[in-house]
Curated annotation (Swiss-Prot):
This is Cadherin-related family member 3. InterPro entries: Cadherin, Cadherin-like_dom, Cadherin-like_sf. One of its GO terms (biological process) is cell migration. Gene3D superfamilies: Cadherins. It comes from Homo sapiens. Pfam families: Cadherin (PF00028). Glycans are attached at N186, N257, N624. Residues 1-19 form the signal peptide.
């Protein structure tokens, strides 16, 4: 345990010894305000880490500061000693700026060990001398009218950064003060005596000194001028009345000096006051000296000065600011033009598209239309153009005449020329436009000339026509061939291929498809040589400028792709079991055709179903017509044969080697025929009346659906749907009619009207019921079956025919036992009564009695009174005598 503690202590000591340290940091340093650059603020050193790796150059450095400043940097002294100094990039002002700066100093050695410490810099206040503000710092002219009462003249004010901020007053003094002036401690200038101009007191030069609490001082000059009072008009002494000035003179430039003198103050013209009475924005005059200066920029080339370069001024001179004597004079300034505007152009970059077949000598660009010089007078407003320059432009373009700015084509711009292609058919012409007068201002004009290609060469195919062969067995998307068109014009534009005419069949509008980009011709569907052996296409190639077409002939190569087709394709045959061998069964003949094979190329064979090989075809090869023969007898008695119904699948192949072909081709097609053969056994019962056995031939006809007759099932289906809809509609109408005319529900009152009787021929009993009917019929309707009109009772539902028919004939009653009455159920209506069949009594001569009990039934099912029977019902339901009775 003790060893572990010692080991941890050693590791801690080693890790601490490996650290990189900034010595004498963190710390606080002081620097005086307004210190010059390079002033030392604080010195420190770097203790290297245990690896003794040196500090990376550029470190230590100040990585951050609060507040942010660039007023300090770290300088290397020697070895591992450094110091923080001022940079002079920012003014350190105790009164106006921050007083304390926290600088983060970062150091890093070559192995990556780092340290970061903070240096706090305090800006210390320094006593600064006081300062005069404004014009007072440069000296000031003061004017006092002669004979003015002694007293206040001027209040002098100065500023001291330290004392002013602490409200400590400054002390003002006059150095070597004359006896006529005195200054108070607060800076007030007083005159002590009345000043007389004529006595020689014309001006006084005073030096004012100000001192702060620290004894620092500053001084300025005061020129006190005594203004003379006089009654003489000042006289101008300057002889010049017209002045010439150049444009673009700097403001403040003296362009004229107007002088005058006052007889009252002879020899002291500076006491006069000058002014310009004319409104002018270009000139100003010193009111004391009479010097005229430029007030603002004078541009000879703009505004009214471009047309009239003269400026007239009226100068006023007077001997006192207010009142007194004055005089006026007219002076004129003529503004002369200087070459201050370079030749310029509306634009300095031109892009010209020139067709490649442009003739030599063609004017491409006239720069005179775009370039100008704003100077107003010659030669300042004149300019010319230098020789054109630019890679590859010297042999193609020229300025003609020289210096005219007219660029003329002198070379060849053929787009397909190799040298022009190497240049990219793009040319840069650089021309300088410059003044002809000093200082020869110039500007570069860049002219980019691009050659536009023209359609010089036609679009042609690499062959005048194309012939392609394709097998008729090839599937869709098979490549037939490829056409290619070229255009020698550059740049190459994309070509689009299309089939303009041809390539159609009876079933397909387009048998071929061409790739619009590559010109590859492909099949859209399989082709048939027997239908169309040759296709002639017109293929068109188009680019942006031209169109060309070529004829393409596609030969369809014939191959054995058609199956033999035989008639009939299926058939039903019947033969007696004892048919003679070699007999043509039912004279059956098979006729076959093949569109791509000769009649001698057929070979016939019977596949599954020919059990015991009873059947064969003759001939079995070399002919398109063959017959079905019986090759061996049937043996059902011996058990050799057991099948009576044969299903033969006949194969018809077009590879007969006995035909005119020397060998079988690679492609062989096989057709099939289905035969159904029924063997008729010997009859089990011998009919003596039949002199000889007969064979009944049964012909089986089978309807086979053909896709071309699609309309037949469609019409049948549509007609069935319409008929079914019509029947449903009629049933709905009938149901509505029954519901409308049968609103009542009546009870049943069934009574048998006759006794049951039996006869020899009677098979069933018929009970005739009658319905009691209301004699009041208040409605009429038409019977939907017969179309006749009947009357009905709206309450009971009873009905009767409106127009009675002929009454039933009355039969003499012979017996009531022969009547076999038929029961009319309650659900039957008029139609049931009308359609009832009555059986006649077997006894001859007897007939139904007049009141045989035939009645009618209303809709409620009640039996009616026989007295109210409708004669029409009786007429329709009388018994019929049996034939032969």
């Amino acid at each position: 345990m003790q060893e572990a503690i010692i080991l941890l202590a050693l590791l801690g000591a080693m890790s601490g010894g490996e650290a990189l340290h900034l010595i004498l940091l963190p710390a606080t340093g002081n620097v005086a305000e307004n210190s010059p650059p390079g002033t030392s603020v604080h010195k420190f050193s770097v203790k290297l880490s245990a690896s003794l790796s040196p500090v990376i150059p550029g470190f230590p450095q100040i990585v951050n500061s609060n507040p942010l400043t660039e007023a300090f940097r770290v300088n290397w002294l020697s070895g591992t000693y450094f110091e923080v100094v001022t940079t002079g990039m920012e003014q350190l002002d105790f009164e106006t700026g921050p007083n304390i700066f926290d600088l983060q100093i970062y150091v890093k050695d070559e192995v990556g060990v780092t340290d970061l410490q903070v240096l706090t810099v305090q800006v210390t206040d320094v006593n600064e001398p006081p300062q005069f503000q404004g014009n007072l710092a440069e000296g000031l002219h003061l004017y006092i009218v002669e004979r003015a009462n002694p007293g206040f003249i001027y209040q002098v004010e100065a500023f001291d950064p330290e004392d002013t901020s602490r409200n400590i007053p400054l002390s003002y003094f006059l150095i070597s003060p004359p006896k006529s002036f005195r200054m108070s401690a607060n800076g007030t200038l007083f005159s002590t005596t009345e000043l007389d101009f004529e006595a020689g007191h014309r001006s006084f030069h005073l030096i004012v000194e100000v001192r702060d609490s620290g004894g620092l001082k500053a001084s300025t000059e005061l020129q006190v001028n005594i203004v003379n009072l006089n009654d003489e008009v000042p006289r101008f002494t300057s002889p010049t009345r017209v002045y010439t000035v150049l444009e673009e003179l700097s403001p403040g430039t003296i362009v004229a000096n107007i002088t005058a003198e006052d007889p009252d103050d002879e020899g002291f013209p500076s006491h006069l006051l000058y002014s310009i009475t004319t409104v002018s924005k270009y000139f100003m005059i010193n009111q004391l000296t009479g010097t005229i200066q430029v007030a603002q920029r004078i541009d000879r080339d703009a505004g009214e000065l471009r047309q009239n370069p003269t400026i007239s001024l009226e100068v006023l001179v007077k001997d006192r600011p207010y009142g007194g004597q004055e005089n006026r004079i007219q002076i004129t300034f003529i503004v002369e033009d200087v070459n201050d505007n370079p030749a310029t152009c509306q634009k300095f970059t031109f892009s010209i598209m020139v067709p490649e077949r442009t003739a030599k000598g063609t004017l491409l660009l006239d720069l005179n239309k775009f370039c100008f010089d704003d100077d107003s007078e010659a030669p300042n407003n004149r300019f010319n153009f230098t020789m054109p320059s630019g890679v590859g432009s010297g042999s193609r373009f020229l300025q003609d005449p020289a210096g005219s700015g007219k660029i003329v084509l002198i070379g060849d711009l053929d787009y397909e020329n190799p040298s022009n292609l190497a240049a990219g058919n793009k040319y840069t012409v650089i021309i300088q436009v410059q003044d002809v007068a000093p200082p020869y201002y110039k500007n570069n004009v860049y002219v980019y000339i691009l050659t536009s290609p023209e359609n010089e060469f036609p679009l042609i195919f690499d062959r005048p026509s194309y012939v392609f062969d394709v097998s008729e067995r090839r599937p869709a998307r098979t490549r037939v061939g490829q056409v290619r068109a070229t255009d020698k014009d550059l740049p190459q534009s994309s070509l689009l291929y299309s089939i303009s005419t041809g390539g159609a069949s009876l079933q397909y509008p387009n048998v071929f498809w061409i790739n619009p980009k590559t010109g590859e011709l492909q099949l859209v569907t399989k082709v048939d040589c027997e239908t169309t052996p040759i296709y002639i296409l017109r293929i068109q190639a188009t680019n942006n400028e031209d169109t060309s077409s070529v004829t393409v002939t596609v030969n369809i190569l014939e191959e054995n792709d058609e199956k033999p087709i035989c008639t009939p394709n299926s058939y039903f045959l019947a033969l007696p079991v004892d048919l003679k061998v070699g007999t043509n069964i039912q004279n059956f003949k098979l006729t076959c055709t093949d569109l791509d094979s000769s009649p001698r190329s057929f070979r016939y064979s019977i596949g599954p179903g020919n059990v015991n090989n009873h059947f064969t075809f003759s001939p079995n090869a070399g002919s398109n017509v063959t017959r079905l023969l019986l090759t061996s007898r049937f043996d059902y008695a011996g058990g050799f044969d057991k099948i009576w119904d044969y299903k033969l699948l006949v194969y018809v192949t077009d590879d007969n080697l006995m035909s005119d072909r020397k060998k079988a081709e690679a492609l062989v097609e096989t057709g099939t025929v289905t035969l159904s053969i029924k063997v008729i056994p010997h009859p089990t019962t011998i009919i003596t009346t039949t002199p000889r056995p007969r064979v009944t031939y049964q012909v089986l006809r089978k309807n086979v659906y053909s896709p071309s007759a699609w309309y037949v099932p469609f019409v049948i289906t549509l007609g069935s749907i319409l008929l079914l809809g019509l029947l449903v509609y009629l049933v709905v109408l009938l149901a509505k009619a029954i519901h409308r005319h049968c609103p009542c529900k009546t009870g049943k009152n069934k009574e048998p009207l006759t006794k049951k009787g039996e006869t020899k021929t009677a098979e069933r009993d018929v009970v005739v019921e009658t319905i009691q009917m209301n004699t009041i019929f208040d409605g009429e309707a038409i019977d939907p079956v017969t179309g006749e009109t009947y009357e009905f009772n709206s309450k009971t539902g009873a009905r009767k025919w409106k127009d009675p028919l002929t009454q039933m004939p009355k039969w003499k009653e012979s017996s009531h036992q022969g009547a076999a009455p038929r029961r009319v159920t309650a659900g039957e209506g008029m139609g049931s009564l009308r359609s009832a069949n009555w059986e006649e009594d077997e006894l001859s001569g007897k007939a139904w009695a007049e009141d045989a009990g035939l009645g009618s039934r209303n809709e409620g099912g009640k039996l009616g009174n026989p007295k109210n029977r409708n004669p029409a019902f009786m007429n329709r339901a009388y018994p019929k005598p049996h034939p032969g009775k």
